[in-house]
């Protein structure tokens, strides 16, 4: 039996690949209209619909999804399974050969691989719960799983009316219901084909165990999906859960356990209808929200507490909203407890089916599974409590231990009380569960450690004297009310106290059991489980605190708005501002300035008239008459300037300097200058100064000049009569007269 479990672990690694492929399978629900046509198979037949064309592109686990989508059409199922093309280099697991047996394999009885296929796709449905809403790929896979799970177990589906009753109240949208009906019709067509094969499977315990796993995996999807997307719970989960209501203890869909009381068909509809109305009444919403926050406490089963709030809301609504249904729920639970006592030893694997045989990484899947396990545990503990604890045994079978003496968290908390309607004081709840798990030693040791560790922790919370709550409920309530106690108290005692007492059922009836009383009681003043009245008082006090405290926090009185009418601004300029909130009337008065009476400061602009309204601008230009203006310079007096561009007449007169000007130098007297460029006439006169000149000083020298012939060409003779000063004594030398004449003549020739 260990081999199929190990194969589940290996196959779950492939289930992770489905998450990667969901984005690529967006058109799966629409028949893959955009995908290329399917190439014909070897025998020449072409697959109708070519639904696996996307899967052919890659040899990854996407090939596994190809047969899954094809099974959605019953008439195309045989051809789709027989003619699926497998790329080269693809393993059997990837191609889906080992996971999806065709009709021949099913007829031959190859059943060992079928549970693997169911678990894989139940996981693939739950891998990404956040993507449930409105996505075609998930709905397609969910339809396939909807076909496979009930048909493999060989159980006929409930009638269509019952399925609709279970589908509709859970908030299913109309399109989801329409999508689920074709799948349900396909199930009715497939179930006869596989009925003989399903009956063969009932022979072995291993197959029963695998059916348990399938049923719980199908049951786990509604809480996990409803908690994240309440409107899109898969039709598979709903139909299976509806059919497996009576057979909840054995977890075999369609085969109710012996002695179990089947619930009416409209039970889930009433429960779901009350679920939507009742959770806001009590503190159920608080634990449900904080249940997710408290999840990290359990490193092994993180999802245990995450899924519990959904069941809390579902069953809590049953007790608070409808007392009549509470009686119904308690009645079947008593039957389940008695039935479970008989089935507990024969089927050792049965409680283990609720255990996480698969990797803990599948978070949403374990949510509902552990929630389902909590139901089994409550039934088991009820039976055990009846045998061990006298207080439970005394209570009537119809209302086992929910007498007013044990309201505990349930009395004040509508979520916790209904979660286990048949729960006794349950000191032995978790040990009972662990003991039922221990026979399944075939599973790896790590799984058993996980069971003891995680279930010890959760069970520690369940098995408190107030243990009327499922592990998720207890965990959430502990997390909300005494967050400090949740981690330290349950972890240490369960490890020490519970495992040795797992086999001893009577040991937990003792009031002084170390594991349960001190560590699990919320108030330290209640050490022993038998003392239920004090616990009742303490529990009644404590639970309302968190809702009241949260309400006091949430419902703080709003601060009144300050009166801004009496506030005056510190800036004086804003006092005259009036603001009308409704949008006041803004009047902008445009007054035109009359500038007709304004006189400009500049006198020259007096005649400029400006009309503000854009009138005609008249600029009067008066030309300046310069005819009367006389220039300061007399020579410009005859210049006439006309401002309009008149004629400029410049008269130039020649000046005669001879008449007015006398030259200081006598030689220039006869020079006449004509302004226009006249003739220059230079007259040279002989100088006769020698004749009149006398030397001022007589130096006694004689200048002898003898010139028998007076000629201008002769060289100057020796001047004997010239004094040292240069003056010539004309008296002493009679010859100077002639000398002077010669010098003057020579100078005249030279142009002097």
Curated annotation (Swiss-Prot):
Cross-link (Glycyl lysine isopeptide (Lys-Gly) (interchain with G-Cter in ubiquitin)): 33, 565, 570, 578, 592, 609, 622, 628, 632, 642, 654, 658, 664, 680, 686, 696
UniProt modified residues of type Omega-N-methylarginine: 466, 660
Disulfide bond is among the record's keywords: yes
Positions with biased composition (Acidic residues): 205-218
Pfam family, one: Tubulin-binding
List of residues that carry N6-methyllysine: 570
A GO cellular component entry from the record: membrane
Localization: Cytoplasm, Cytosol; Cell membrane; Cytoplasm, Cytoskeleton; Cell projection, Axon
InterPro entries named among the record's database cross-references: MAP2/MAP4/Tau, MAP_tubulin-bd_rpt, Tau
Single Gene Ontology BP annotation: axon extension
Tissue specificity remark: Expressed in neurons. The larger forms (isoform tau-A and isoform tau-B) are preferentially expressed in the peripheral nervous system while the other are expressed in the central nervous system. Low amounts of the larger forms are also found in limited areas of the CNS.
GO molecular function: apolipoprotein binding; DNA binding; enzyme binding; heat shock protein binding; Hsp90 protein binding; identical protein binding; lipoprotein particle binding; microtubule binding
Modified residues (N6-acetyllysine): 474, 536, 570, 592, 601, 609, 622, 628, 632, 642, 654, 658, 680, 696
Post-translational modification Phosphoserine, affected residues: 35, 50, 191, 204, 489, 496, 502, 506, 509-510, 513, 525, 546, 548, 573, 596, 600, 604, 616, 635, 663, 667, 707, 711, 715, 720, 727, 733
Segments annotated as Tau/MAP repeats: 555-585, 586-616, 617-647, 648-679
Coiled-coil annotated spans: none
Bias (Low complexity): 219-229, 498-525
Residues the record lists as Phosphothreonine modifications: 58, 60, 100, 464, 480, 486-487, 492, 516, 523, 528, 542, 714, 738
Free-text comment on this protein's domains from its UniProt entry: The tau/MAP repeat binds to tubulin. Type I isoforms contain 3 repeats while type II isoforms contain 4 repeats.
Assembly behavior: Interacts with MARK1, MARK2, MARK3 and MARK4. Interacts with SQSTM1 when polyubiquitinated. Interacts with PSMC2 through SQSTM1. Interacts with FKBP4. Binds to CSNK1D. Interacts with SGK1. Interacts with EPM2A; the interaction dephosphorylates MAPT at Ser-388. Interacts with PIN1. Interacts with LRRK2. Interacts with LRP1, leading to endocytosis; this interaction is reduced in the presence of LRPAP1/RAP.
Protein name per Swiss-Prot or TrEMBL: Microtubule-associated protein tau
Organism name: Rattus norvegicus (Rat)
Gene encoding the protein: Mapt
């Amino acid at each position: 039996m260990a081999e199929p479990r190990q194969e589940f672990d290996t196959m779950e690694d492939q289930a992770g690949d489905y998450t990667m492929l969901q984005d690529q399978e967006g058109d799966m629900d629409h028949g893959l209209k955009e995908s290329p046509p399917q190439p014909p198979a070897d025998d020449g037949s072409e697959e109708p619909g070519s639904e696996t064309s996307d899967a052919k592109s890659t040899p990854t686990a996407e090939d596994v999804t190809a047969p899954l989508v094809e099974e959605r059409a019953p008439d195309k199922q045989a051809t789709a399974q027989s003619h699926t093309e497998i790329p080269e280099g693809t393993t059997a697991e990837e191609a889906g050969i080992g996971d999806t047996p065709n009709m021949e394999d099913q007829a031959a009885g190859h059943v060992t691989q079928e549970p693997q296929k169911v678990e894989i796709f139940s996981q693939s449905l739950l891998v990404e719960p956040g993507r449930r809403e409105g996505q075609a790929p998930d709905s397609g896979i969910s339809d396939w799983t909807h076909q496979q799970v009930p048909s493999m177990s060989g159980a006929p589906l409930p009638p269509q009316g019952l399925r609709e009753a279970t589908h509709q109240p859970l908030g299913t949208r109309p399109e989801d219901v329409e999508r689920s009906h074709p799948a349900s019709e396909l199930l009715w067509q497939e179930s006869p084909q596989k009925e003989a094969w399903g009956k063969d499977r009932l022979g072995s315990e291993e197959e029963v165990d695998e059916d348990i796993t399938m049923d719980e995996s199908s049951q786990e999807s509604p809480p996990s999906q409803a908690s994240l997307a309440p409107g899109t719970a898969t039709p598979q989960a709903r139909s299976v859960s509806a059919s497996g209501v009576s057979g909840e203890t054995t977890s075999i869909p369609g085969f109710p356990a012996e002695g179990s009381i089947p619930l009416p068909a409209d039970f889930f509809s009433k429960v779901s209808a009350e679920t939507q109305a009742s959770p806001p009444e009590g503190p159920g919403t608080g634990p449900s929200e904080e249940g997710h926050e408290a999840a990290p406490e359990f490193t092994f089963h993180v999802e245990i507490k995450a899924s519990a709030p959904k069941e809390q809301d579902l069953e809590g609504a049953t007790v608070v909203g409808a007392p009549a249904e509470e009686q119904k729920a308690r009645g079947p639970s008593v039957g389940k407890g008695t039935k479970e006592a008989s089935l507990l030893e024969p089927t050792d694997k049965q409680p283990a089916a609720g255990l996480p045989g698969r990797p803990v990484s599948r978070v949403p899947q374990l949510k509902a599974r552990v929630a389902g396990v909590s139901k089994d545990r409550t039934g088991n503990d009820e039976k055990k409590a009846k045998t061990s604890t006298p207080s439970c045994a005394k209570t009537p079978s119809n209302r086992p231990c929910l007498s007013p003496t044990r309201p505990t968290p349930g009395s004040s908390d509508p979520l916790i009380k209904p979660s286990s309607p048949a729960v006794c004081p349950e000191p032995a709840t978790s040990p009972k569960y662990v003991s039922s798990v221990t026979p399944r030693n075939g599973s790896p040791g790590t799984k058993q450690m996980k069971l003891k560790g995680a279930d010890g922790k959760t069970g520690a919370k369940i098995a408190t004297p107030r243990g009327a709550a499922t592990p998720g409920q207890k965990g959430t309530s502990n997390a909300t009310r005494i967050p400090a106690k949740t981690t330290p108290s349950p972890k240490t005692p369960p490890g020490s106290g519970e495992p040795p007492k797992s086999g001893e059922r009577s040991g937990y009836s003792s009031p002084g059991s170390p594991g349960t009383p001190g560590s699990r009681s919320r108030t330290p003043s209640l050490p022993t489980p038998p003392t239920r009245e004090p616990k009742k008082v303490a529990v009644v006090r404590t639970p309302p605190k968190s809702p009241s405290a949260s309400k006091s926090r949430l419902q703080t009185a709003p601060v009144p708005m300050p009166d801004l009418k009496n506030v005056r601004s510190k800036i004086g300029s804003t006092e005259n501002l009036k603001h009308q909130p409704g949008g006041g009337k803004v009047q902008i008065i445009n007054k035109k300035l009359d500038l007709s009476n304004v006189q400009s400061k500049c006198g020259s602009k007096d005649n400029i008239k400006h009309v503000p309204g854009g009138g005609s601008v008249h600029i009067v230009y008066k030309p300046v008459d310069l005819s009367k203006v006389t220039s300061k310079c007399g020579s410009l007096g005859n210049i006439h300037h006309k401002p309009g561009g008149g004629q400029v007449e410049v008269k130039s007169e020649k000046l005669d300097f001879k008449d007015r000007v006398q030259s200081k130098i006598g030689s220039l007297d006869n020079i006449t200058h004509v302004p226009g460029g006249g003739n220059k006439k230079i007259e040279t006169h002989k100088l006769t100064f020698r004749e009149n000149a006398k030397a001022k000083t007589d130096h006694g020298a004689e200048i002898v000049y003898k010139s028998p012939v007076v000629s201008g060409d002769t060289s100057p003779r020796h001047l004997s009569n010239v004094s040292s000063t240069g003056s010539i004594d004309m008296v002493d030398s009679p010859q100077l007269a002639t000398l002077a004449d010669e010098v003057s003549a020579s100078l005249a020739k030279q142009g002097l």
